[in-house]
Amino acid sequence: ERSRRPPRNEINAVLSFVYTLQTRDIQAALETANLDPAAGWLHTLRPGRPSLALDLLEEFRAPLCDRLVLSLFNKHQLTDKDFEYDSLAVMLNERGRKTVLTAWRDRKQEEITHPYLGEKIQVGLIAYVQAMMLARVLRGDLDCYPPFVWR
C-alpha cells in the first residue's frame, strides 16, 4: 500500500524520492518549453504546487520511476542499511540517497526508441520531448498530445 508524508516503509521512501527527482526534471523541461509547471489539468491548482509537472509525471511513474525502484530492490542494491527508521517514518540515509542517485543518473543516460518519434533518445530527455510536444499541441502545431507509452 502506498504511504507518503511520511513514507512508512522502504519502497515508499524510495518511490517518494524518485518521484521528486522526476518531477523536478519535468518542471525544468516545461520551463524550457515555455510552459508554466503550475498550470495543470489533472492535479489541483495550489500555490507552489507544480500541477502540470505532476500531470506529466503520471506518464512516467510505471515505466521509469516504479521500474527503477523495483530494480534497486530486486537486485539488492538497497538494503536496510540504506534507511533511517523512527516510529513514524522510513527515510533514505546518505548512503541510500547516493545509491538511488547513481542509479537515477545511469538510467537517464540509457537510450530507448521513443514510441511516438521512432528515434533513439536518452531516457533523461523524455520529459523534454514530452514537454515540447505538449507545447506544440497548445500552440496548434500538433493535433493531439501523444502520451509517452513505453512497452
List each language-model region with its residue ranges.
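Active-site helix-to-loop segments that bind/position phosphate- or nucleotide-bearing substrates
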Residues: 1-151
